[in-house]
């Protein structure tokens, strides 16, 4: 008899066994992840297994065979993870703590709410209790909310919702009660931050800046544009469009507004504080409330803003005195500066970081207001430069780098209560851990790893954050300020899907370009058996300054391939992040040689180290830069591949340099503009190697992708069809550079999996 069974037979109670229908289905008798007798207690998250001496002798001997019988179907029913699981999983985000760290609030998106539609609500958990009670829903079922924040006294939670028809700010007692609408502005509130005393908000909204503080003016102008008989728009400068949106003249602008008293009428007026700056605050398209911060005294707001400068004909430089500007340099410069904005909107903005021509971001004040912490790059025009951690003495305006020897790019800044340390996450050797940085010495200590940590926040002695891995989407975790006592507040993907078997993964390394150490990951198929071989999905990440590491993606998720019976190989080639800035820099102006050498050597090394990889049945897949590499490989390294999948890739470098919107990217990566350095664009241009294409290819592109316009995909498909190569084109009229809509994601994965099955089986 197994030891676990003897323990049960001896009458010892197994406590804290998770019910099979609620999460990790661990049987108290056999210790297996199976459906067992404990499944009958599905109504509670934890149960006690009764000592068998309390049962009759006949029942005692009946229990163990029952456990065996119920275990077998569970094991046999194990299946792989697929896209329908992925889009149906809950998604948690935005952990927020009360000031004393005793209460946690977080957002959870559910695929189906009470009205049958996806909805994101707020949930809360008392962290002072150690029971297994699940988090409690805070906001009403069916409401869509985001951006939670807690009041200074910890009694009220604030959030944004479009319940009224436009996105406005709401408040709700943490103890329970109905939400109260606090703002009734004529435009959407895009982001906000509470003032230190909780009586005001700084918020951002997209407005016409000549409207000043009159929010109704923007609403009227938009109505006039909508009702105009002619649809044409005349532009005299860039951006014409950005990411997935055409420029209609609005700028993200910061405002300050008083909040009404409890039960008071929603406020409709606000004072613009950044309208005199001809830039977006926060930046488009992804800026948020981490781009601005209140001073502790509430007298000012510091914001990261890129202010475009005029330029003269042909030079691409600032206009000379007397020269007529022909546009502005916003699309090809990354000079974001920190501006101090008067919260009353009276004093002129002050540039605090004018001496740095590169990117300054993420301002955070010390509690006494004497020090301003922020992140800064050093090289203008390079979006993937290292973000160093900076400390500015507010009185003198002098700054110093806190950890100059720490060769990682900081993701955010969270200050410790005593002001002696800060917390930040960063890519690091194929993961994204949480680090603690000593402000005086610059010493960096990794606190939480084993996956990817995001959204850290600190209050009292409590850290809260989300963490994910190659086997699970985000979970909310809490720990002490040293990263100890780690506790999961929400369930993992495995607990939410007990019938799913996820593919195991392992990191490996090899010598790549320049004999440097290069890292990669291999994910086994869900149904892996020793001695068998499996077809391979070879995934190539985008960026190119990015990483395919130990993290979860709701778009490019290796488990969706492992769940179909494929092994997965991913290589962090030169240019990837988390291996030092020199490693990241190595790809610029070398898109087609150094990374390709890493991919080639990585593919060889993976096959040598993992005998279950069937190198004769392999397809390569990539998006964005990964899509560029797929096009490049089609003409320069097509021998190993039975098929290729290209999503939103660069097909023609030269036309990309003219058609993309963020010109600084193409100009940095190719060594200048297409007319000044045409050789830089043609050196590794996939379009010049179409004559060698022969491998079947699936091309995917979205109409709203203005980063790599749809014509790139159409041109590639035209070449494939004209050459008579087996090919398909999957087109999304309503998606941008990413496929975000759940139904479209299902179609994307079904089409890709069908393509793989056609060419390498499974």
Predicted regions and their residues:
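Residue-level detector of Asp-centered blade-edge/turn motifs that repeat once per structural unit
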Residues: 99-100, 152-153, 196-197, 296-297, ...
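Non-catalytic accessory segments flanking enzyme active sites
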Residues: 96, 202-204, 227, 231-236, ...
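Hydrophobic beta-strand positions that form the internal "hydrophobic ladder"
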Residues: 101-104, 154-157, 201, 301, ...
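Short beta-strand element of the alpha/beta-hydrolase
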Residues: 532-542
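A flexible loop/linker signature enriched in serine peptidases of the S9 family
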Residues: 108-121, 139-146, 158-170, 184-190, ...
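Active-site-proximal cap/loop segments of hydrolase catalytic domains
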Residues: 557, 562-563, 570-762
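Short loop/turn segments that connect beta-strands within beta-propeller blades
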Residues: 127-130, 173-177, 259-262, 342-346, ...
């Amino acid at each position: 008899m197994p030891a676990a069974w003897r323990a049960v037979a001896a009458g010892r109670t197994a406590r804290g066994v998770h019910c099979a229908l609620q999460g990790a289905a661990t049987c108290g008798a056999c210790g297996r992840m199976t459906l067992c007798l404990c499944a009958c207690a599905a109504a509670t998250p934890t149960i006690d297994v009764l000592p068998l001496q309390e049962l009759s002798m006949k029942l005692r001997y009946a229990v163990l065979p029952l456990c065996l019988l119920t275990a077998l179907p569970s094991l046999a029913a194990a299946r792989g993870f697929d896209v329908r699981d992925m889009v149906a999983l809950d998604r948690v985000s935005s952990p927020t703590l009360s000031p004393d760290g005793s209460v946690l609030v977080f957002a959870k998106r559910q695929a189906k709410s009470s009205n049958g539609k996806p909805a994101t609500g707020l949930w809360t958990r008392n962290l002072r209790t150690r029971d297994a009670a699940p988090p409690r829903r805070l906001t009403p079922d069916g409401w869509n909310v985001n951006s939670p924040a807690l009041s200074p006294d910890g009694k009220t939670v604030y959030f944004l919702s479009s319940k009224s028809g436009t996105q406005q700010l709401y408040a709700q007692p943490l103890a329970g009660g109905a939400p109260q609408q606090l703002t009734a502005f004529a435009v959407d509130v895009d982001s906000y931050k509470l003032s230190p005393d909780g009586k005001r908000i700084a918020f951002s909204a997209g407005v016409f800046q000549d409207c000043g503080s009159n929010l109704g003016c923007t609403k009227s102008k938009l109505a006039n544009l909508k009702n105009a008989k002619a649809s044409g728009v005349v532009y005299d400068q860039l951006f014409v469009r950005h990411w997935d949106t055409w420029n209609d003249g609005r700028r993200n602008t910061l405002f300050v507004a008083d909040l009404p008293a409890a039960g008071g009428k929603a406020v409709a007026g606000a004072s613009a504080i950044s309208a005199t700056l001809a830039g977006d605050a926060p930046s488009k398209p992804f800026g948020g409330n981490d781009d601005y911060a209140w001073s502790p005294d509430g007298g000012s707001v510091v914001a990261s803003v890129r202010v475009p400068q005029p330029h003269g004909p042909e030079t691409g430089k600032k206009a000379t005195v007397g020269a007529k500007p022909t546009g502005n340099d916003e699309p090809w410069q990354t000079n974001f500066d920190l501006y101090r904005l008067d919260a009353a909107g009276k004093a002129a903005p002050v540039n605090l970081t004018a001496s740095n021509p590169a990117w300054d971001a993420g301002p955070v004040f010390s509690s006494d207001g004497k020090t301003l912490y922020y992140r800064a790059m050093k090289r203008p025009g390079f979006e993937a430069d290292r973000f160093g951690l900076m400390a500015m003495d507010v009185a003198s305006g002098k700054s110093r780098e806190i950890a100059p020897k720490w060769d990682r790019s900081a993701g955010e800044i969270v200050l410790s209560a005593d002001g002696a340390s800060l917390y930040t996450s960063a890519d690091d050797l194929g993961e994204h851990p949480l680090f603690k940085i000593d402000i005086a010495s610059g010493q960096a200590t990794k606190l939480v790893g084993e996956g990817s940590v995001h959204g850290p926040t600190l209050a009292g002695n409590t850290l809260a954050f989300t963490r994910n891995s190659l086997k699970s989407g985000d979970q909310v975790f809490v720990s002490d300020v040293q990263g100890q006592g780690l506790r999961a507040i929400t369930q993992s993907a495995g607990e939410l899907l007990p019938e799913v078997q996820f593919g195991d993964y392992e990191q490996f390394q090899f010598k790549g370009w320049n004999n440097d150490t290069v890292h990669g990951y291999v994910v086994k198929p869900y149904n892996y058996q020793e001695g068998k071989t499996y077809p391979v999905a070879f995934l190539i990440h985008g960026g190119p300054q990015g990483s395919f590491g130990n993290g979860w993606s709701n778009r490019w998720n290796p488990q969706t391939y492992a769940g179909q019976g494929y092994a997965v190989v991913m290589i962090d080639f030169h240019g990837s992040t988390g291996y030092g800035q020199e490693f990241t820099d190595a790809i610029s102006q070398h898109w087609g040689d150094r990374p390709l050498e890493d991919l080639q050597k990585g593919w060889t090394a993976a096959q040598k180290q993992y005998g279950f990889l069937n190198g004769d049945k392999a397809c390569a897949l990539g998006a964005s830069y990964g899509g560029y590499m797929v096009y490049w490989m089609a003409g320069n390294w097509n021998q190993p591949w039975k098929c290729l999948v290209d999503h939103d890739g660069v097909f023609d470098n030269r036309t990309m340099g003219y058609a993309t919107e963020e010109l600084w990217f193409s100009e940095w990566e190719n060594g200048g503009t297409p007319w000044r350095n045409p050789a830089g664009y043609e050196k590794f241009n996939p379009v010049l190697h179409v004559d060698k294409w022969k491998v079947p290819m699936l091309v995917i592109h979205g109409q709203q992708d203005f980063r790599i316009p749809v014509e790139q995909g159409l041109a590639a498909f035209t070449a494939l069809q004209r050459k008579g190569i087996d090919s398909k084109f999957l087109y999304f009229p309503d998606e941008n550079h990413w496929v975000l809509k759940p139904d479209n994601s299902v179609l994307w994965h079904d089409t890709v999996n069908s393509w793989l099955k056609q060419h390498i089986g499974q």
